[in-house]
Design a protein with these regions (language model features):
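Charged, compositionally biased interaction regions
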Residues: 6, 14-270
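Internal mixed beta-strand/loop scaffold within catalytic domains of large alpha/beta enzymes
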Residues: 1-3, 9-11
Length: 270
């Protein structure tokens, strides 16, 4: 806030804990460097050179400065959400030095139509985060970011409904949980959020994707339970809105008994 440039170090490669910590949805205040040390079972090894922090375990370290007035255009290019990103101005890193260890490996992954190599990261994140999510989002039972949709654009969630149990069952507390999910951390990047009531079907799981959709579609009142958030902030890579980082989101909430019977077979004329 007080300087016209700041120093940046990019770490590439190193132990798996480095790459995994970089993509982990960590709570506010817990740095990726600290989490990498927790995963590795020892502190993050680093040293200082010319005012830059260098990882002692990385395959490559790229150092440079980012100037606040040094914007240059980037794009257009394709991205993992399926859109073709337009050209925009972004900050520029002016590289000073590139360091590497002996016989370094440049790490990368293949992305595209799921499942791809990065799908394994998503699966592992779910395993680690699932027990912690109810503590971060009170009332939540579980949440699942769907890999086939690009992970964060589509969330399936199950939450408890404890408001006014003596009234006719309508989505109430689960809407509070839905707004919490869309207002915090990486779950705020979701474009579509489907949320169901745990008490309606205690055996329901977000990981049984066909079963989850059957549960929601057989209960949802489409005249009442499509909750749009318009003119809000959305993912930078989402070009479905009317501006950059601007668009809409949709919450689909289902609570109560079955109100329609779903078809289980395709008609012969289809």
């Amino acid at each position: 806030q007080t300087r016209d440039e700041f120093k940046v170090t990019i770490f590439v490669g190193g132990p798996p804990s480095h790459a995994f910590a970089a993509i982990m949805p960590l709570p506010e205040g817990l740095s990726e460097v600290t989490f990498a040390g927790l995963l590795a079972g020892r502190r993050f090894r680093y040293f200082i050179k010319d005012g830059y922090v260098l990882s002692a375990d990385a395959d490559f370290c790229i150092t440079g400065t980012v100037r606040l007035d040094g914007m240059k255009p980037e794009g257009p290019f394709g991205d993992h959400l399926g859109y073709y990103s337009l050209q925009h101005d972004f900050p520029v890193l002016e590289i000073k030095n590139i360091y590497h260890r002996k016989n370094p490996i440049w790490h990368f992954t293949v992305v595209g139509r799921p499942p791809q190599e990065d799908s394994n990261f998503g699966w592992l994140i779910h395993q680690l985060v699932e027990p912690l999510a109810p503590k971060e989002f009170p009332g939540l039972k579980e949440v699942h970011a769907i890999d086939a949709a690009g992970v964060h654009p589509l969330l399936l969630a199950i939450a408890h409904e404890r408001y006014m149990p003596f009234r006719p069952p309508v989505p109430e507390e689960i809407l509070t949980v839905a707004n919490h999910l869309l207002g915090k951390g990486q779950t705020s990047l979701a474009k579509y959020l489907l949320i169901a009531c745990h008490e309606d079907a205690p055996q329901l799981s977000t990981h049984d994707i066909p079963g989850y959709f059957q549960h929601v579609l057989s209960r949802i009142d489409l005249s009442r339970e499509l909750h749009f958030q318009t003119r809000t902030t959305i993912d930078t890579l989402d070009y479905s809105g009317d501006g950059w980082n601007a668009g809409s989101k949709l919450v689909i909430a289902a609570r109560g008994p079955v109100i329609r019977k779903l078809g289980s077979e395709l008609p012969q004329n289809i």
